[in-house]
């Protein structure tokens, strides 16, 4: 049984509230879970009280092989429970084709202006 530490949505329409739960990876988002280990209220204005975690139980479930989802991993990294690896996107920071064409055209114009007549 693959375990996930993930978010389960609660609250009313347009007022989300999430429970951080340990659940089987195959169960629905708001379905059956094994244990509730925290909560996240994204509507609160300050970051501190937004996230509440039961760190002892989370450590236990991580030891049992539960894998946190990306959003939960961000919370765990913020409190120092589990390190979130940096993503490697080498092509994302590069400009697109049109931008590269504009840059090369600007370089050619600059070279032509700086060349002696």
From Swiss-Prot:
InterPro entries, per the entry: Ribosomal_bS16, Ribosomal_bS16_dom_sf
GO biological process, one term: translation
GO cellular component labels: cytoplasm; small ribosomal subunit
Stretches with biased composition (Basic residues): 81-90
Pfam families for the chain: Ribosomal_S16
Keywords from the UniProt entry: Ribonucleoprotein, Ribosomal protein
Region entry Disordered, spans: 81-117
Keyword Ribonucleoprotein: yes
Similarity annotation: Belongs to the bacterial ribosomal protein bS16 family.
UniProt xrefs under HAMAP family: Ribosomal_bS16
Name of the protein this chain belongs to: Small ribosomal subunit protein bS16
